[in-house]
Amino acid sequence: MNNEQRGVALLIVLMLLALMAALAADMTLSFHSQLQRTRQVNHHLQRQYDIELAEKLALASLTQDVKDNDRQTTLQQYWAQPQQLQLEDGNTVKWQLRDAQHCFNLNALAKISDDPLASPDFPAQVFSALLINAGIDRGNTDEIVQSIADYIDVDDSPRFHGAEDSFYQSQTPPRHSANQMLFLTGELRQIKGITENIYQRLIPYVCVLPTTELSINLNMLTENDIPLFRALFLNNITDADARVLLQKRPREGWLTTDAFLYWAQQDFSGVKPLVAQVKRHLFPYSRYFTLSTESISDEQSQGWQSHIFFNRKQQSAQIYRRTLQLY
């Protein structure tokens, strides 16, 4: 073999070595990528298991508390206390159940009358009063109430101050009214008359539940909820009046709505004309709850928010929606 042939052979060997090195590097990268994906899947499955465990424990405590006392839902009960559990794998899971009925359910506006000559339905009157208490100009209340009602009702006929598809299609970007119940309070931002300032003023007092009922738990209202509390009485009571009524609540909570309204009438004359209407929307117990769960590991945290309906007749709880929380 001459020098030229030896050179060619050496070049071929070097090319083969380079190819083998490239293949080895590619296989190593592929292996590391696959290993990383496997780890991520395992971490995700573990966090999902942690969260499901917390859900089961939270629902069990809620169910037991209702069995022990099915007439009241209060913050003194065990279900309302924050919980934490250290798992064998080193992860920590935390959870907190919260009542979801110390707020105005926006979906209650779906049923209000569209007759411009009729007196406003009580939920519409309550919401108008709440808007005023939240610092929103009285001149904007009709537009906001009717626009929300139009956005979630099933027809395409706008109310006098409301808006349907004909309005939303002219916006940028064009869009449609939902024609169904709201799923998130953030949907308010899409509705005619709701500015960011109005949204931020409203958000502490409103919620969305999968029902068109307006049902508020009188045992869950605090001084932070005074604007809503006053609105329930169409602002016939002052902030100071509302504070007095909240302070009269027994430590273990009101046992019945009648007991609360009896004392309210004794102290404040503005309550009496509204007793029959308020009684239909004020209760000493809750059926809707929100569970916030967080799974914490050395690498990262993941949280879920589970939305719960408790069937009091069957004394069973079910999760009807979950949303991911980022940390």
Curated annotation (Swiss-Prot):
Q: Name one GO cellular component term.
A: plasma membrane
Q: How is it modified after translation?
A: Cleaved by prepilin peptidase.
Propeptide residue range(s):
1-7
Q: Where is it located?
A: Cell inner membrane
Identify the stretch annotated as signal peptide in this record. none
- Which residue spans belong to the Periplasmic compartment? 28-327
Keywords (A to Z) from UniProt: Cell inner membrane, Cell membrane, Membrane, Protein transport, Transmembrane, Transmembrane helix, Transport
InterPro entries the record matches? GspK, GspK_central_sf, Pilin-like, T2SSK_SAM-like_1st, T2SSK_SAM-like_2nd
Q: Which superkingdom does the taxonomy of this entry point to?
A: Bacteria
**What is the induction comment?**
Silenced by the DNA-binding protein H-NS under standard growth conditions.
UniProt record, GO biological process: protein secretion
Regions crossing the membrane: 7-27
Family matches, as NCBIfam families: T2SS_GspK
Query: What is the annotated role of this protein in its UniProt record?
Result: Component of the type II secretion system required for the energy-dependent secretion of extracellular factors such as proteases and toxins from the periplasm. Plays a role in pseudopilus assembly and seems to control its length. Interacts with the pseudopilus tip complex that is critical for the recognition and binding of secretion substrates.
The further comment given in this record reads:
Part of a cryptic operon that encodes proteins involved in type II secretion machinery in other organisms, but is not expressed in strain K12.
Subunit structure, briefly? Answer: Type II secretion is composed of four main components: the outer membrane complex, the inner membrane complex, the cytoplasmic secretion ATPase and the periplasm-spanning pseudopilus. Interacts with core component GspG.
Instruction: Report the sequence similarity comment from the record.
Output: Belongs to the GSP K family.
Q: What is this protein called?
A: Putative type II secretion system protein K
Per the UniProt record, the source organism is Escherichia coli (strain K12)
